């Protein structure tokens, strides 16, 4: 989140009068630009850090709220939401555990496309093995297999939990942009004071 706030007592802010309004106008314009610059920087960092499969996560990195008052400006950049709930765990890392079932089903190579996206869920392939070209399915040693007349194929690994390492893309983008943010906000203040 980007935040700019004029801090001081009410008497000082009142003395600034119209100058304060000019400074805040310039800061608002600068913050709006920086908000969009940060979106792009986070998307660039995401491309560098994560293997892009569907593009959903990178597409969820968007400008969030933008609130401006006489003394405060706040601009946010958001990622995730909806089906992209995993954005936070990619940024910070953590352990995923099943909620309503006993195991997580992790797709193995035969159950994924070339870009690594699951072709179907374990539930779907169990309910209708023919969607994957199988005649049946079965579990053995923590693996869901698909059966064909020619043999068996491992499709999903069953896990009680999976720990993902932190793969930050938002925080590094903000750190890389810090000099630009400081420079552009200082310039906006100077321009507002000169008006």
Predicted regions and their residues:
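Short, Lys/Arg-rich flexible segments
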Residues: 1-195
């Amino acid at each position: 989140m980007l935040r700019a706030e004029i801090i001081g007592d009410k008497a000082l802010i009142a003395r600034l009068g119209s100058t304060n309004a000019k400074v805040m106008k310039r800061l608002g314009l600068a913050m709006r630009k920086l908000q969009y610059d940060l979106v792009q920087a986070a998307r660039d960092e995401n491309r560098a850090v994560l293997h892009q499969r569907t593009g959903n996560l990178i597409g969820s990195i968007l400008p969030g709220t933008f609130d401006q008052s006489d003394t405060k400006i706040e601009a946010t950049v958001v990622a995730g939401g909806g089906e992209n709930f995993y954005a936070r765990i990619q940024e910070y890392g953590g352990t995923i555990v099943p909620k309503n079932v006993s195991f997580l089903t992790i797709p193995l190579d035969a159950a994924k496309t070339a870009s690594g996206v699951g072709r179907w869920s374990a539930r779907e392939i169990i309910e209708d093995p023919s969607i994957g070209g199988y005649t049946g399915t079965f579990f053995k040693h923590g693996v869901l297999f698909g059966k064909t007349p020619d043999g068996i194929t491992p499709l999903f690994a069953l896990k009680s939990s999976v720990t993902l390492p932190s793969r930050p893309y938002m925080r590094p983008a903000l750190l890389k942009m810090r000099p630009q943010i400081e420079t552009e906000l200082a310039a906006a203040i100077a321009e507002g004071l000169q008006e």
